[in-house]
Each structure stands twice: as structure tokens, then as C-alpha cells.
Amino acid sequence: MRAGVFRIRFWGVRGSYPAPGPRTAGIGGNSSCVEIATDEHALVFDAGTGIIQLGRALVQRPGKPIVHIFLSHLHHDHIEGLRFFAPAYSPEWKCYVYGANSTAPTLKTLLAQTMTQRFFPVSLSQLPARISIRSLGKHDRVRLPGAQPTFVQARFSTAHPKVGVMLYRITHAGHSVVYATDVESPKGGYEDVVAFARGADVLIHDAQYTDEEYHGGHLNKAGWGHSTVRMAAEAARAAGVGQLLLYHHDPEHDDAEVRQLERLARTIFPHSRAATEGLEVRVTPR
């Protein structure tokens, strides 16, 4: 990869649960996982089922066997692929896992509980890879060294009700990408999300619901911790970002509906695009 470039690739774009099948084949059916690669580092955001294919790809690539995984929160659709992540089963690999600080129980304990024998045959402590789990504070930063260092700012937000969510801003070679999944934005955008994303080159934003799903009927989704496509576009406009990538699509939305929602987003923020499985976006030096 050319120096100063970083690449965004989507390995899973669904929220709530995977949605495989012909009706979702164009957009993709795997749950949340985004890779951001610089010339020196592999960064992964969330570990839904998309991380399974990513893991298979990583072990085939040349380069250092090191990966950094940043978790937004611990709902199942964001961690369900971690147990099947190929690098975790190789002693050659070093896997750093980051997430929101939790004192009782700790982040490590919570992840270990998903791999007890009641739920899975291999425990966290039995994985052959060298795994380091780090809890992040509400306003934290991770520096990844290199010829051009990469910085990951972490910001805890209450935009996901009840448990909260970690937002991440990745900065490399003067460019930045913001990862803001599982946020529920009122009209004009959730204030701390908009402030955190201000001026970013790319904003990856939750866009799970239609207006009707969010507001209407006896099963409206208000308070469930996700945005409508309209909310995502309004947040991008308020933050003045370069490009909006709509993410965390509802598993009930087929390819045609996601494309229709993409068109709606563009009427509010023209530089909007629906994230699809396999989509690559390159951010290049100025």
C-alpha cells in the first residue's frame, strides 16, 4: 500500500443478526465488521460474523501477524464472530482487543463468559494466539507507532441507551475516519457524535431504520439505540464530513430497500453511500 494511504473495507454491514440469502446478496448478510488498514497496521472495528472471512484473509497476507480489534460494545451482533477468528488460533499472532472500561465484571471477564464450555468448546484462555485485552476510558487514545503513526481516539457515548457505545476516530497521515455504529441520533444528530465526527473525511454511521419503523405502530423502534437513515444523513451534514457511509443495515431490509434508503440519504447529504459487504474505500494523502 502506498505510504499515507489507508483503506476501509467492509466485511459485515448488518445489524442485529446475520441475514444471508438471495434477497440480501447485493448488500451482504454478515453482521458488523469493518477493517481499516494503513501501510503498517491492521485495525478491525467490531467482531460480528464478518470478522470470520476477514480472519481467513489475514492469515494469508504477508506482513506482521498483529491485529488490533476495537469493540463498540458487547451486544451479540458485534462479538459473535470473535470465537471463529482464524488468527486467534495461531500462536504466531498477537491480537489486541479494546473496548469500553467495565470494572465489575471487567471487559476480559465479559468476553471470557461468551466462551465458557456452556456456550463454546474452546475457552478464551485456551486460544493459541497471544491475546491482550485492554479496557479504554471514556476519553482515551491509542497510538500505533510507525513511520506515520496512527491514532485511535475513543469516546464513550450514551447515544446507545442503557449500555452506551464506544465511538472511534482513526487518524493517519492527516486524514480521519469516524466509526459511529449503534447510535440513536435525534433530528440534526446526537450532539456528542456530531462534535466527535466534525470535519472527518469519512463517517461510518448507524442507519438501521426507516422513518416508519422508528416512529410508527405498536412496535416502533424509538429508544432501541439505532438511527434512521434520515438521522444519519442529518448528522453527517451537521458534522461537515466528506463522505457518509450508511451502516448497520436492518436484516429485514433487502437489497432494493437499502438502495432506496441510500437515495433518500442523498437528498439530505449528497455524499452518502450504503456500505456493502466487500466495499473498499481508499483515503489518500492531500
Could you describe each region identified by the protein language model?
Residues 1-178, 188, 258-285:
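Binuclear metal-dependent hydrolase catalytic cores
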Residues 176, 184-278:
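Cap/insert and terminal regions of metallo-dependent hydrolase folds
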